[in-house]
């Protein structure tokens, strides 16, 4: 009863926001703008009003952290290891190059623009993997600020809209094959809804293949989350050691405890993928779990939006938006060039 009293109001508020956001998203062809983006933006718009009601705080914090992890875990039901084999070795090669481009280029641009490494990393993850889902998965393990999460999702979304419009035109111009275009869209466009829109705008075959490639690309969340978790712990220890320099008794010489920093929700995510791969779960149940995962994700993004105001975003300046634009453009170009080299266009 105490839990319900403390958390229910905030959780129910985000659930209502998720329903409204889903309704608005359904009004748009191809669901070009996902419900998560609407929830985030509406939440930020309501922040000045909602922040006055402290009764919501516990529920909003619970939703933006605990329910977010649950959404990521359940998302595993949409994937299977057989999909990796289905897309083929050439597709995996392209994905490797786009991931290296997103994170390598993101790191260099982050240094150039003197950005906080967490915001830079979130934008790179959103661009290189799968938009808001990747950003949401990485944010807990690096203790990202809500404003950074909101900015990263907004930055990747803006370029996604541009790509949905230009990709089919470019595909026709370059006379790409259905599979070649599907691979390009699946590896270079970020959010799933945007991949669907860009893929099927070219052809049904291209749309089907682009979605498979996109889902396979999502599996790279696992190693990336582990790497970011380790980097964050190393930087925390480095900061502590610098603060206590000269005091040997407080100096952190011990090795990093992997079990302590390991993001266990990612292990459960893999368990869900493994269960899906066995085929023991009926499609009706896996479809329901997938829908539930998406709804919980929208709730979580809504909670993050409700905890973020536009002023905190403005503090980051214009550099992160430029960072996101350049990284997105690089990923698009690299994906196309690698496909050309492999003869897959």
From Swiss-Prot:
The keyword Protease does not apply. The chain crosses the membrane at residues 7-24, 28-50, 70-87, 91-113, 120-142, 152-174, 181-203, 209-231, 261-283, 316-338. Its main location: membrane. One of its GO terms (cellular component) is plasma membrane. Keywords: Cell membrane, Membrane, Transmembrane, Transmembrane helix. Coiled coil: none annotated. It is found in: Cell membrane. It is a multi-pass membrane protein. It comes from the Bacteria. It holds the Pfam family Cons_hypoth698. InterPro entries: UPF0324_pro. Belongs to the UPF0324 family. This is UPF0324 membrane protein CTC_01844. It comes from Clostridium tetani (strain Massachusetts / E88).
């Amino acid at each position: 009863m105490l839990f319900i009293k403390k958390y229910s109001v905030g959780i129910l508020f985000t659930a209502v926001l998720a329903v409204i956001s889903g309704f608005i998203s359904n009004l748009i062809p191809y669901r070009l703008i996902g419900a998560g983006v609407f929830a985030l933006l509406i939440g930020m718009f309501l922040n000045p009003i909602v922040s006055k009601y402290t009764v919501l705080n516990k529920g909003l914090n619970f939703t933006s952290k605990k329910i977010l992890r649950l959404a990521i875990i359940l998302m595993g039901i949409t994937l299977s290891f057989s999909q990796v084999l289905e897309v083929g070795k050439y597709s995996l090669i392209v994905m490797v190059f786009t991931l290296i481009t997103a994170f390598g280029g993101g790191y260099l641009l982050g240094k150039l623009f003197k950005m906080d490494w967490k915001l830079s990393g979130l934008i790179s993850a959103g661009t290189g993997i799968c938009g808001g889902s990747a950003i949401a998965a990485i944010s807990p393990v690096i203790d990202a600020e809500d404003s950074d999460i909101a900015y990263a999702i907004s930055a990747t979304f803006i370029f996604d809209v541009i790509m949905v419009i230009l990709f089919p035109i470019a595909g026709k111009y370059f006379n790409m094959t259905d599979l070649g275009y599907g691979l390009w869209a699946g590896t270079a466009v970020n959010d799933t809804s945007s991949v669907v829109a860009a893929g099927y705008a070219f052809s049904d075959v291209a749309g089907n293949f682009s979605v498979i490639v996109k889902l396979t690309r999502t599996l790279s969340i696992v190693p990336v989350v582990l790497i970011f978790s380790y980097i964050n712990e190393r930087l925390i220890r480095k900061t502590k050691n610098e603060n206590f320099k000269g005091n040997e008794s407080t100096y952190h010489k011990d090795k990093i405890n992997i079990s302590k920093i390991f993001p266990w929700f990612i292990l459960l995510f893999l368990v869900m993928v493994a269960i899906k791969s066995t085929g023991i779960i009926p499609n009706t149940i896996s479809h329901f779990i997938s829908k539930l995962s998406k709804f919980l994700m929208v709730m979580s993004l809504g909670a993050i939006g409700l905890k973020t105001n536009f002023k905190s975003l403005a503090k980051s300046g214009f550099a992160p938006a430029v960072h996101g634009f350049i990284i997105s453009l690089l990923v698009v170009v690299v994906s196309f060039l690698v496909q050309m080299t492999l003869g897959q266009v």
